[in-house]
Swiss-Prot record:
This is Enoyl-[acyl-carrier-protein] reductase [NADH] FabI. GO terms for biological process: fatty acid elongation. Homotetramer. Pathway: Lipid metabolism; fatty acid biosynthesis. It comes from Helicobacter pylori (strain ATCC 700392 / 26695). It catalyses: a 2,3-saturated acyl-[ACP] + NAD(+) = a (2E)-enoyl-[ACP] + NADH + H(+). The record marks R203 as: Involved in acyl-ACP binding. The keyword Amino-acid biosynthesis does not apply.
Length: 275
């Protein structure tokens, strides 16, 4: 028996079969969930519909989170097709490319507002819109990153947005807890996705994480997907307001990993460069 058998969930923000939202959707489907999906525009619809078909879902809706009328339409469509929901996955984040270059000091007010509206307020509006459809014990999950609390090169205004997103998770967890609805964030390590492709030097970031994480590896899409499924299922029924890390332990590190060489501690990163 699957952990999500008979449960219905909405996946918001899947971009392709490399995205974290896809990994979560696949794991939920494997555990018996019925899924619905959203797409941003016609261009992304062509990517999302094959994913929905792969996961046996006829439910695909347009949702541009910057358009209020789309939320109303989404509510009506989900209510008509599914009646209610047991979980929501919010995988929406955006900042203009120029805001991920240079320094935070150079961030324009327009870029700042865009990042906050799309990456943070969308979770609040989505949850509030669909709250009447959420069943007792439902779960809401959003995606964050370590750049919310630590400096990450080239992350800039998205670090601020993720910090605000994690704060929103805590406040929403309290607001919705009285209705027995849980809200959590999943903070994954670096993975090659459409979103990460916009971050400069991402290949170096992947290698740095692999060398310095306690598990000496990068996480897989399957590992992140399974963790997401856990947070959406009754397996985590006592968990809310949490930021759950799936990053091979990288978030616990205070400095680069070291190893003994010639009777002295040497950075693994330096040893790797010598090879």
């Amino acid at each position: 028996m699957g952990f999500l058998k008979g449960k219905k969930g909405l996946i918001v923000g899947v971009a392709n079969n490399k995205s974290i939202a896809y990994g979560i959707a696949q794991s939920c489907f494997n555990q018996g969930a019925t899924l619905a999906f959203t797409y941003l525009n016609e261009s992304l619809e062509k990517r999302v519909r094959p994913i929905a078909q792969e996961l046996n879902s006829p439910y695909v809706y347009e949702l541009d989170v910057s358009k209020e009328e789309h939320f109303k339409s989404l509510y009506n469509s989900v209510k008509k097709d599914l009646g209610s929901l047991d979980f929501i996955v919010h995988s929406v984040a955006f900042a203009p490319k120029e805001a991920l270059e240079g320094s935070l000091l150079e961030t324009s007010k327009s870029a700042f507002n865009t990042a906050m509206e799309i990456s943070v307020y969308s979770l609040i509006e989505l949850t509030n819109t669909l709250k009447p459809l959420l069943n007792n014990g439902a779960s809401v999950l959003t995606l964050s990153y370590l750049g919310s609390t630590k400096y990450m090169a080239h992350y800039n205004v998205m670090g601020l947005a993720k910090a605000a997103l994690e704060s929103a998770v805590r406040y929403l967890a309290v607001d919705l807890g009285k209705h027995h609805i849980r809200v959590n964030a999943l903070s994954a390590g670096p993975i090659r996705t459409l979103a990460s492709s916009g971050i400069a030097d991402f290949r170096m970031i992947l290698k740095w994480n692999e060398i310095n994480a306690p598990l000496r590896k990068n996480v897989s899409l399957e590992e992140v997907g399974n963790a997401g499924m856990y947070l959406l299922s009754s397996l985590s029924s006592g968990v809310s307001g949490e930021v759950h890390f799936v990053d091979a332990g990288y978030h616990v590190m205070g400095m680069g990993a070291v190893e003994e060489k010639d009777n002295k501690a040497t950075l693994l990163w330096d040893l790797h460069k010598e090879q």
